[in-house]
């Protein structure tokens, strides 16, 4: 290696932040046989949703008297149904130890990411308040071609408008609203960074999944809605998705 190369090495990698839509499975009981049966029923309702889907296993909602989790067996059942476990969320010592034993990352329990810090009062010099900067609003992203199965389209910082059909297995994501002027047969996730005022509009509700700010319904639930197949507007009230006719 020359002296110039050793002093100025060419980088071989980059570390970048990324926003991914990841499903969280909150386990209520450790009965893996029942889990296997219920997962099979879910897969039958929305097979495209369970195709190599990244998953966080949440064990922090288990009751204190619930028995130990067969974590390798749990991961194996999820994999058989198309769910790929990336990490677990846990607070019981035995669950954390089991995850470490199979080399799975352990995330903090739900609600444990923030901690209260007692403030130290420091008298700061008075400043003239500055006018807050205008929010950066990105233009609406408009898609005019059909969205095929396996495609993922993301409108960062704004709304997404699709004026063509959306096929099963396709995924639409937006920080703001989603408009689909055609049949919506894939997945639509609006307000993915937590905007609870985001909405979903579509001319024909036939979706595998709809979600606003993390609250979602799958096709199994949507098919029971009397507005299935109709033009609808979807909004969020608390943690409930409201579907009304357009």
UniProtKB/Swiss-Prot annotation:
Keywords: Cell cycle, Cell division, Septation. The keyword Isomerase does not apply. InterPro entries: CAP/MinC_C, MinC, MinC_C_sf, MinC_N, Septum_form_inhib_MinC_C. One of its GO terms (biological process) is division septum assembly. Belongs to the MinC family. Cell division inhibitor that blocks the formation of polar Z ring septums. Rapidly oscillates between the poles of the cell to destabilize FtsZ filaments that have formed before they mature into polar Z rings. Prevents FtsZ polymerization. PANTHER family: SEPTUM SITE-DETERMINING PROTEIN MINC. This is Probable septum site-determining protein MinC. It comes from Pseudomonas savastanoi pv. phaseolicola (strain 1448A / Race 6). The lineage of its organism: Bacteria, Pseudomonadati, Pseudomonadota, Gammaproteobacteria, Pseudomonadales.
């Amino acid at each position: 290696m020359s002296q110039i190369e050793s002093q100025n090495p060419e980088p071989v990698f980059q570390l970048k932040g990324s926003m991914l839509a990841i499903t969280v499975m909150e386990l209520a009981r450790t009965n893996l046989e029942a889990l296997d049966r219920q997962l099979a029923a879910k897969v039958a309702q929305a097979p495209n949703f369970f195709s190599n889907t990244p998953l966080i296993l949440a064990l922090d909602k288990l009751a204190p008297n619930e028995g130990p989790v067969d974590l390798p067996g749990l991961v194996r059942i999820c994999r058989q149904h198309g769910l790929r476990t990336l990490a677990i969320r846990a607070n019981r010592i035995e669950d954390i130890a089991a995850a470490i034993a199979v080399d799975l990352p352990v995330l903090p329990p739900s609600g444990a990411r923030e901690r209260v810090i007692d403030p130290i009062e420091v008298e700061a010099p008075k400043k003239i308040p500055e006018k807050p900067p205008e929010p950066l609003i990105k233009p609406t992203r408009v898609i005019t071609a059909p969205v095929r199965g396996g495609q993922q389209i993301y409108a960062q910082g704004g709304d997404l408008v699709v004026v063509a059909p959306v096929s099963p297995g396709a995924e639409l994501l937006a920080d703001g609203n989603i408009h689909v002027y055609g049949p919506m047969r894939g997945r639509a996730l609006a307000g993915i960074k937590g905007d609870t005022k985001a909405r979903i509009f579509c001319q024909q509700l036939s979706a595998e999944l709809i979600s606003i700010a993390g609250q979602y319904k799958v096709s199994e639930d949507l098919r029971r809605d009397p507005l299935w197949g109709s033009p609808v507007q979807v909004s969020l009230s608390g943690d409930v998705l409201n579907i009304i006719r357009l």
